[in-house]
Amino acid sequence: MIDDDGYRPNVGIVICNRQGQVLWARRFGQHSWQFPQGGINPGETAEQAMYRELFEEVGLNRKDVRILAATRNWLRYKLPKRLVRWDTKPVCIGQKQKWYLLQLMCNDADINMQTSSTPEFDGWRWVSYWYPVRQVVSFKRDVYRRVMKEFASVVMPLQESTTQRNTPGYRRKRG
């Protein structure tokens, strides 16, 4: 499904742990890393697509995560000309994406990149929050920067509470 401007509707998924780190996934058989993402099927809402992609790409179900935020607007990136499939109709020139920030509620061991016969990823790791902006392929960098900036106000308190808990002499206030 390609829109009138040539963009494929898509969802992107940022999964964070309780320390505010984000899941960074290695594309199958490649040396490139990215967040999970995937197309929205006809008749599917963005949220439904997000849960489907979440299972297909990282083996997690709705019960394994909690939605913390979603981008207010669709974010777009253009594909480099060398990646555009000019022989398809309609021609897809890029992706327009709705992004979701999820908190992992299960154990790391529940993450499974092998739920599909054609997996998207063959490895993953936790990285610091801003790391993906510097490391993602260049044509996605602006979208990643915008996503992470929009979600930062939600994730930063997670990092601060972890830092406080790990500080010698820190005591949680009660009641």
UniProtKB/Swiss-Prot annotation:
InterPro entries: Nudix_hydrolase (IPR020476), NUDIX_hydrolase-like_dom_sf (IPR015797), NUDIX_hydrolase_CS (IPR020084), NUDIX_hydrolase_dom (IPR000086), RppH (IPR022927). GO terms for biological process: mRNA catabolic process. CDD domains: NUDIX_Ap4A_hydrolase_plant_like. The keyword Hydrolase applies. Keywords: Hydrolase. The keyword Ribosomal protein does not apply. It comes from the Bacteria. Its cofactor is a divalent metal cation. Its EC number is 3.6.1.-. It is an enzyme of class 3 (hydrolase). Residues 6-149 form the Nudix hydrolase domain. One of its GO terms (molecular function) is mRNA 5'-diphosphatase activity. A motif (Nudix box) lies at residues 38-59. Pfam families: NUDIX. GO terms for cellular component: cytoplasm. HAMAP family: Nudix_RppH. PANTHER family: M7GPPPN-MRNA HYDROLASE. Accelerates the degradation of transcripts by removing pyrophosphate from the 5'-end of triphosphorylated RNA, leading to a more labile monophosphorylated state that can stimulate subsequent ribonuclease cleavage. Belongs to the Nudix hydrolase family. RppH subfamily. This is RNA pyrophosphohydrolase. It comes from Erwinia tasmaniensis (strain DSM 17950 / CFBP 7177 / CIP 109463 / NCPPB 4357 / Et1/99). The lineage of its organism: Bacteria, Pseudomonadati, Pseudomonadota, Gammaproteobacteria, Enterobacterales. The gene is rppH.
